[in-house]
């Protein structure tokens, strides 16, 4: 069976997906170890038996909802190819906006950044790749996630970032110019309305009590203790949570509070400055 014939079959099996052709080509490029462009211009090439079997297994897994990032074990974020596993959230394109906003606020005096709940290390590594003079720390309460983050750091050869265990601020003993977090912010009542793909991701990195706001408030409440004066706190949150998150920032004495939308036009990021 050649690439063209397999691709047509795969697209039919993935017809319920948002972009079946793109997803089928991603799986092909992973198995054949080539670019999507190479696949497009070489569709008459025959697949080996081993390649055919692996591709069919991948298509089945995708057809029942497993995210492609977990199937191939990687996801691109901020032009970085990151390893991911079932123990880490899959980095989203919308979170790149968080990185952009942090970069817009930094100045020559900023030297230290803390990424709370780092997961695969996406935010910390994206920042480290841009500013080699910063000292960046990523923490997580999952040793499995930290293992993936460390693998990504080594693979990318980024020397100015380190990862270690901390349950939010539990093991933090210093102050930072910037603290950033993409914490769990989905409420328990929202679970049934989620796409089935999301159920493959670690629930403790997704779900938070008090309508998804428990961890967000805890972080905002404690962040001032770990920020230098005039330091910034950046939080990613749910699209209906902007007003509540802004209220928490005001309640815990932050100012210059701003919120920004994601690529879909939904409120997604709020940040404020320590007084």
Swiss-Prot record:
Any GO BP annotation: methylation
Top-level enzyme category: transferase
Disulfide bonds: none
UniProt feature coiled coil, ranges: none
InterPro entries tied to this protein: DNA_methylase_N6_adenine_CS, HemK-like, N5-glutamine_MTase, PrmC_N, RF_methyltr_PrmC, SAM-dependent_MTases_sf, Small_mtfrase_dom
Keywords: Methyltransferase, S-adenosyl-L-methionine, Transferase
Binding site for substrate: 182-185
EC number: 2.1.1.297
UniProt-annotated binding residues for S-adenosyl-L-methionine: 117-121, 140, 168, 182
Protein name: Release factor glutamine methyltransferase
Lineage: Bacteria, Pseudomonadati, Pseudomonadota, Gammaproteobacteria, Enterobacterales
């Amino acid at each position: 069976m050649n690439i063209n014939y397999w691709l047509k079959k795969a697209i039919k099996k993935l017809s319920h997906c948002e972009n079946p052709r793109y997803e089928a080509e991603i799986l092909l490029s992973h198995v054949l170890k080539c670019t999507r462009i190479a696949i497009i211009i070489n569709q008459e090439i025959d697949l080996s038996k081993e390649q055919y079997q692996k591709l069919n297994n991948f298509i089945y897994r995708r057809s029942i909802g497993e995210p492609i990032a977990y199937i191939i074990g990687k996801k691109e974020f901020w032009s970085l190819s990151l390893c991911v596993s079932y123990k880490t959230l899959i980095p989203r394109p919308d979170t790149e906006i968080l990185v952009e906003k942090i970069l817009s606020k930094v100045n020559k005096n900023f030297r230290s950044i803390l990424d709370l709940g780092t997961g695969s290390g996406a935010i910390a590594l994206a920042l480290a790749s841009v500013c080699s003079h910063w000292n960046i720390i990523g923490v997580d309460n999952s040793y499995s996630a930290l293992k993936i983050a460390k693998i990504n750091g080594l693979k990318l050869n980024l020397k100015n970032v380190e990862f270690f265990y901390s349950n939010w601020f539990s093991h933090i003993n210093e102050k930072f110019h910037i603290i950033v977090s993409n914490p769990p912010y989905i409420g328990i009542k929202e679970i049934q309305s989620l796409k089935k793909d999301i159920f493959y991701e670690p629930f403790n990195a997704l779900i938070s009590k008090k309508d998804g706001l428990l961890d967000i408030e805890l972080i905002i409440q404690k962040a001032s203790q770990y920020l230098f004066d005039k330091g910034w706190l950046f939080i990613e949150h749910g699209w209906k949570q902007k007003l509540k998150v802004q209220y928490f920032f005001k309640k815990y004495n932050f100012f210059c509070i701003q919120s920004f939308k994601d690529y879909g036009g939904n409120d997604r990021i709020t940040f404020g400055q320590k007084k």
